[in-house]
Amino acid sequence: MERSASVGVNDGRFGGNQFYSPSFSSSSSSSSMRHVNYSCGSCGYELNLSSTNRITSTIGSKYGKSMKSGIISFFNIDEGRFSQVDEFQCMPHFSRYSWGLFRHRTKLLCRKCNNYIGNASQEKAPEYALVTQNSDPTSPRIGSVTKYDIRIRSLQPSSAVALL
């Protein structure tokens, strides 16, 4: 399936660029799907962060807001690659789903250069239980899930691997 579009000189959407001609093809889009491994943006230390472990449920309506704030979230990291510093704050905090006077979070630092990478925080488990082939749906759910919020500017891509 091949689709192409051309925009004329007088079309104001692209500033009169007569050479704008995006092409979309199903064969090129499948070969361009890659996952990226990230390393520390300061020293280049491999953090074993992979884009396959990103929380992609926020991609959609909240994706633009997440990118503007410079944060990407992961559900799994290699904790051996980070130094972790527990932080307790005694000040009012408000977010969309919680508020309080005390906040506990864990700062994630690069193990090699101690550059601030992001935060780990506990979140409530979803109201529904995910059932997989090997899981028992009658077993009790875990009360909270750890979410890792990583600053984009603290990372650099170390490699990109094509998915087939």
Swiss-Prot record:
Q: Which GO terms describe its cellular component?
A: chloroplast
Location in the cell reads: Plastid, Chloroplast
Q: Which PANTHER family match?
A: METHIONINE-S-OXIDE REDUCTASE (PTHR33674), OS01G0833400 PROTEIN (PTHR33674:SF8)
Recorded source organism is: Arabidopsis thaliana
Q: Where is the transit peptide?
A: 1-60
Task: Report what the protein is called.
Answer: Uncharacterized protein At4g08330, chloroplastic
Keywords of this entry:
Chloroplast, Plastid, Transit peptide
| InterPro entries from the UniProt entry | At4g08330-like
Short name of any one Pfam family annotated for the protein: At4g08330
